[in-house]
């Protein structure tokens, strides 16, 4: 099977880019591939432990009824497959104070992205705009 590296830069809930990336990772894992995710800039907040769901006022549902998935929940599910590795850029974490993560991601730097890119069959960089 192939190994894919994806670099993400968007903060949670800023655009559809993050959702698209998560769906790509999920699809690759379901096909048996391994995926490395390097979170850079605002994407280091995707794994923040204290994210909360919210009610859906359009549908009139409560927090419990809405079952709004957080990016941290989504990432945790991907990591649980054993086919995904996740690195948060340490400089970006420090700049944003985004250090309280779910279990699984590790701290790294741009050199890790380079190493993963060299070892991967394909690399996808998903910028902010």
How would you name each of these model-derived features?
Residues 6-19, 35, 41, 47:
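Short, glycine-rich nucleotide/cofactor-binding loops
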Residues 29-30, 79-80, 117-118:
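Anion (oxyanion) recognition and catalysis
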Residues 1-5:
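Extreme N-terminal starter segment of soluble prokaryotic enzymes
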Residues 55-88:
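A glycine-rich helix N-cap at a beta->alpha junction
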Residues 43-56:
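N-terminal beta-loop-helix "entrance" segment that forms/cooperates
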Residues 18-31, 37:
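Histidine-anchored nucleotide/phosphate-binding helix
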Residues 84-129:
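N-terminal glycine-rich phosphate/adenylate-binding segment common to multiple enzyme folds
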Residues 8-11, 56-63, 94-100:
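Short, basic, glycine/proline-bearing loop/turn elements
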């Amino acid at each position: 099977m192939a190994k894919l590296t994806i670099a993400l830069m968007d903060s949670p809930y800023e655009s559809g880019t993050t959702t698209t990336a998560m769906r790509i990772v999920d699809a690759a894992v379901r096909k048996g591939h391994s995926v490395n995710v390097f979170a850079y800039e605002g994407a280091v907040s995707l794994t923040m432990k204290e994210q909360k769901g919210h009610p859906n006022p359009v549908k009139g549902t409560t927090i419990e009824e809405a079952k709004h998935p957080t990016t941290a929940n989504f990432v945790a599910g991907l990591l649980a497959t054993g086919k995904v590795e996740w690195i948060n850029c340490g400089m970006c974490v420090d700049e944003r104070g985004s250090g309280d993560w779910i279990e699984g991601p590790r701290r790294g730097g741009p050199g890790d992205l380079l190493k993963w890119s060299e070892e991967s069959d394909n690399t996808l960089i998903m910028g902010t705009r």
